[in-house]
Structure formats: C-alpha cells, structure tokens
Amino acid sequence: GSLKGFWGQDVKQIQEQLETIPWVKGAVVRKIWPNRLSIWLSEYQPVAIWNKTEFVTKDGTVFQLPMDKLKEKVLPYLGGPDYQSLKVLEAWNQIFADFKAKNLVVKGVAIDDRGAWQVTLDNDIVLKLGRGDWKPKLDRFVTIYPQIEVPEGKRIDYIDLRYAAGAAFWAETA
C-alpha cells in the first residue's frame, strides 16, 4: 500500500503480509521510536525436496520455496501425499543411516497413495518395496545386491522386492 508515516503503520497488517510468504514460518514486527520498524522473520528450513516442487522441514511441514534460495545445498528427494510427509521423512532417516553403514547411498524415498514404498539409490536404481513393512525387504536387498550379475552393456533399472522371498530385477541398455 501507500506510505503512512511512522504512526500510521499497522504492524499487525505488515506481520500478516510477511507471513503469507510461503517460506516464512513466523514474523514479529514492532515500532521503534522515533522512526524505525523492527522486523524479525523465522524461516522454514528445508531438509528434503518434497514431490519435486516443494520442500519439507525436519518436523514434516511441507512448504514452498524458490529453488534458487537453496544455493548449493544438495537435498534428498522425498515424495508422497502431504499427510505422509513425517512418515516418509522418518523412513528416509532410518534407511539413509542403515544403507550408509553398508556403503550404499540413498537418493530418495517415496510412498504412493496406496501406501507402496519406493527407494531410489544414488545410481538411480529404484527399489520397489510395496506396502507394509519395508525393513525386511531392504535387508533382503542388501543381502542379494552384491550377487546380482548384470548382463554386459546393461544397467539395472529397478529391483522388485515385493515378493515374500527373493526379488526380480529389470536391466536396460546402459
């Protein structure tokens, strides 16, 4: 709006306008005599990219942020319905730690609308885990992965671990 001078400024309105910015968690605006406004902003801190276009905080809050605000930060890719954000983030933390201990790097974790889990490794291999408890399926993957022989000139696209025992994999031309 228009400039209203020091006394004419509505600090509540300024605060509300600042809080409409998607990455602003909260704002405090105060008048400081004789002619200043004090503005304090609290921003959401992204820990992962959510559904390719948004971000998620460590407590599972989904929010928007211009990609250029990330600078050089490399974040994992997580995905799923917004109400599942905290569950996916917790799964990411567990899977990332478990795999790191086994010298495997996870790039992303997602759950679909039906509750089926999927993990993407840093080499772009997708692990299809299906619904339910994914932990034993990932344990099985860690056991069989070193034994998989990929045909010459091919690369693994995905490994399907939805079976009760064993797995299937799909290899495409590299």
Predicted regions located by residue number:
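Solvent-exposed helix-coil-helix hairpins and adjacent flexible coil/strand "hinge" segments
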Residues: 109-140, 165
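Short, well-structured beta-strand/strand-turn elements
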Residues: 20-35, 107
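Short, glycine-/polar-rich solvent-exposed loops and beta-turns at beta-strand/coil boundaries
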Residues: 11, 29-35, 111-112, 161
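Periplasmic/extracytosolic POTRA-like scaffold domains at the N-termini of outer-membrane
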Residues: 1-22, 64-90, 132, 150
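Extracytoplasmic/luminal low-complexity segments enriched in Pro/Gly and acidic/polar residues
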Residues: 131-174
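Short beta-strands and strand-coil junctions in structured, solvent-facing domains, enriched
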Residues: 4-5, 25-26, 35-36, 45-48, ...
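Extracytoplasmic segments of membrane-associated envelope/inner-membrane machinery
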Residues: 37-114, 120, 126
